[in-house]
């Protein structure tokens, strides 16, 4: 990462991320989509456990995409959720997106900032189904001319190597 940002800029970007999390928790998916850049890259790969000796050699086991979405694909996912016919979200999940350890730095691209946050996503559904997703997100945010923000990239890294939930229909 490059140079760290000022406290004021850190606060503004953090507030953008907190607002984005509340939109997801409140099922305001269309408002959330409006926070995304047209060029959004929204990705998550499987997590694979590597032996220490392999990591020291720089060997990483192959992974598979869980998500590798564009804005159009995210819009289709949300349209499906809005139909009320998405079985994975009947009844709808109740979520809480918690983010912490927010580290923000400049990039080589003007008005684009790299953000690393740890997250905990709690999901409750039906009476007894509960799931915790924990990991790190690597985001890039773009500052617009009107001083608003857009999410340009989100790379989601799960700590869990085995996903025990019934599905991954929630947004991170």
UniProtKB/Swiss-Prot annotation:
Is Iron-sulfur among the key words of this record? no
Annotated GO molecular function terms are:
3-phenylpropionate dioxygenase activity
Please provide the Gene Ontology terms (biological process) for this protein: 3-phenylpropionate catabolic process
User: Which Gene Ontology cellular component annotation is one that this UniProt entry carries?
Assistant: 3-phenylpropionate dioxygenase complex
- Which reaction equation describes what this protein catalyses? 3-phenylpropanoate + NADH + O2 + H(+) = 3-(cis-5,6-dihydroxycyclohexa-1,3-dien-1-yl)propanoate + NAD(+); (E)-cinnamate + NADH + O2 + H(+) = (2E)-3-(cis-5,6-dihydroxycyclohexa-1,3-dien-1-yl)prop-2-enoate + NAD(+)
Listed pathway(s): Aromatic compound metabolism; 3-phenylpropanoate degradation
Q: Which SUPFAM superfamilies match?
A: NTF2-like
Q: Which UniProt keyword terms apply here? A: Aromatic hydrocarbons catabolism, Dioxygenase, NAD, Oxidoreductase
Leading EC class: oxidoreductase
Q: Report the EC number(s), separated by commas if there are several.
A: 1.14.12.19
Pfam families xref list = Ring_hydroxyl_B
Q: What does this protein do?
A: Part of the multicomponent 3-phenylpropionate dioxygenase. Converts 3-phenylpropionic acid (PP) and cinnamic acid (CI) into 3-phenylpropionate-dihydrodiol (PP-dihydrodiol) and cinnamic acid-dihydrodiol (CI-dihydrodiol), respectively.
Instruction: Note the NCBIfam families from the entry.
Output: 3PPDioc_HcaF (NF042947), PRK10069.1 (NF007479)
Q: How does it assemble?
A: This dioxygenase system consists of four proteins: the two subunits of the hydroxylase component (HcaE and HcaF), a ferredoxin (HcaC) and a ferredoxin reductase (HcaD).
- Indicate the family of this protein: Belongs to the bacterial ring-hydroxylating dioxygenase beta subunit family.
Task: Give the protein name, as stated in the record.
Answer: 3-phenylpropionate/cinnamic acid dioxygenase subunit beta
Q: Which organism is it from?
A: Escherichia coli (strain K12)
Gene name on record?
hcaF
């Amino acid at each position: 990462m490059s140079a760290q940002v000022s406290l004021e800029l850190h606060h503004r970007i953090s507030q953008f991320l907190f607002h984005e999390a509340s939109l997801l928790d409140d099922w305001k998916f269309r408002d959330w989509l409006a926070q995304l850049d047209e060029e959004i890259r929204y990705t998550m790969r499987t997590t694979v456990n590597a032996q220490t000796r392999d990591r020291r050699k720089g060997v990483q086991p192959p992974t598979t995409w869980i998500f590798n979405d564009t804005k159009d694909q995210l819009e289709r996912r949300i349209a499906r959720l809005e139909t009320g016919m998405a079985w994975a979200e009947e009844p709808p999940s109740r979520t809480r997106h918690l983010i912490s350890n927010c580290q923000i730095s400049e990039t080589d691209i003007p008005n684009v900032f790299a953000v690393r946050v740890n997250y905990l996503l709690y999901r409750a559904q039906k009476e007894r189904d509960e799931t915790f997703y924990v990991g790190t997100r690597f985001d890039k945010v773009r500052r617009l001319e009107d001083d608003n923000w857009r999410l340009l990239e989100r790379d989601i890294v799960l700590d869990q190597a085995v996903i025990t939930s019934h599905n991954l229909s929630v947004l991170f």
